[in-house]
């Protein structure tokens, strides 16, 4: 090897660890160093693992929010299109009367 520590495999967390991390994230999207140390000790994980879990979780949240926004915009476009069609329909009807 070239002296670099080999990259670790993917960390798998126990259900308990995940639940505790999610609970913490629910109250705080960012951790103080002090809190990170506390959680690391409580869950038998390293500070680095906690830090990276939170980074990944914030990214996941950002992606989810982006997806919701996209769905809402799509729905709005469809509503506007339907309103336009309805409007045209009514105008056509008015001409016939």
Swiss-Prot record:
Its main location: nucleus. Residues 6-65 bind DNA. The keyword Nucleus applies. It holds the Pfam family Abdominal-A. SMART domains: HOX. One of its GO terms (cellular component) is nucleus. It is found in: Nucleus. GO terms for molecular function: DNA-binding transcription factor activity, RNA polymerase II-specific; RNA polymerase II cis-regulatory region sequence-specific DNA binding. The keyword Nucleus applies. Residues 73-86 have a biased composition (Basic and acidic residues). GO terms for biological process: anterior/posterior pattern specification; negative regulation of transcription by RNA polymerase II. InterPro entries: Abdominal-A (IPR022132), Antp_homeobox (IPR050296), HD (IPR001356), HD_metazoa (IPR020479), Homeobox_CS (IPR017970), Homeodomain-like_sf (IPR009057). Keywords: Developmental protein, DNA-binding, Homeobox, Nucleus. Residues 73-97 are annotated as: Disordered. Sequence-specific transcription factor which is part of a developmental regulatory system that provides cells with specific positional identities on the anterior-posterior axis. Required for segmental identity of the first through tenth abdominal segments. Belongs to the Antp homeobox family. This is Homeobox protein abdominal-A homolog. It comes from Manduca sexta.
């Amino acid at each position: 090897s070239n002296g670099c520590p080999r990259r670790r495999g993917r960390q798998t967390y126990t259900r308990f660890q995940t639940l505790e991390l999610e609970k913490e994230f629910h109250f705080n999207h960012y951790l103080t160093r002090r809190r990170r140390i506390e959680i690391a000790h409580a869950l038998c994980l390293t500070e680095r693992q906690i830090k990276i879990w939170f980074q990944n979780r914030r990214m996941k949240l950002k992606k989810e929010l982006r997806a919701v926004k996209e769905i809402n915009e799509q729905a709005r476009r469809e509503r506007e299109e339907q309103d336009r069609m309805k409007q045209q329909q009514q105008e056509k009807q008015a001409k016939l009367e």
